Swiss-Prot record:
Organism the protein comes from: Psychromonas ingrahamii (strain DSM 17664 / CCUG 51855 / 37)
GO cellular component, one term: cytosol
NCBIfam families: panD
Role of this protein: Catalyzes the pyruvoyl-dependent decarboxylation of aspartate to produce beta-alanine.
Cofactor names: pyruvate
Keywords assigned by UniProt, alphabetized: Autocatalytic cleavage, Cytoplasm, Decarboxylase, Lyase, Pantothenate biosynthesis, Pyruvate, Schiff base, Zymogen
Pathway membership, UniProt: Cofactor biosynthesis; (R)-pantothenate biosynthesis; beta-alanine from L-aspartate: step 1/1
Keyword Phosphoprotein: no
Catalytic activity entry: L-aspartate + H(+) = beta-alanine + CO2
Gene encoding the protein: panD
UniProt-recorded Gene Ontology molecular function terms: aspartate 1-decarboxylase activity
Pfam families registered for this protein in UniProt: Asp_decarbox (PF02261)
Listed name of the protein: Aspartate 1-decarboxylase
Length: 126
């Protein structure tokens, strides 16, 4: 049996552009894509912290070093410039793959600079 597991995450990314008339997708700074292990044209899930919207699209490469997070096409109706979003990727893994699996977690500041990276989500305490 396969389980769907988190593989990459950009946490609290800030939307820098919302381009309604662009073809679709989400353009992400190439440095951020690489740190999170997200591939160009890979399906991504975007969770908007500001309004609760959750939607799927695909990643395209944004200019390296630009700190760009550009939500494009119809999805631009679900995110505004300045919104904090969480961008995730997932994969279906079998039991043997899950044993050693660790996601690539990238935590960002308000300017989309990398604050830290991790392979583990901290334990939530009461």
């Amino acid at each position: 049996m396969k389980k769907t597991m988190l593989t990459g995450k950009l946490h609290q990314a800030r939307v820098t552009h919302a381009e309604l008339n662009y073809e679709g997708s989400c353009a992400i700074d190439q440095d951020l894509l690489e740190q999170a292990g997200i591939l160009e044209y890979e399906q991504i899930e975007i969770y908007n912290i500001e309004n609760g919207a959750r939607f799927s699209t695909y990643a395209i490469t944004g200019e390296r070093g630009s700190k760009m997070i550009s939500v494009n096409g119809a999805a631009a109706r679900l995110a505004a410039v300045g919104d904090r979003v969480i961008i995730c990727t997932y994969a279906s893994l079998n039991a043997a793959e899950i044993v050693n699996h660790k996601p690539s977690l990238v935590y960002l500041d308000a300017q989309n600079n990398i604050v830290r990276t991790s392979k583990d989500v901290p334990v939530q305490v009461a």
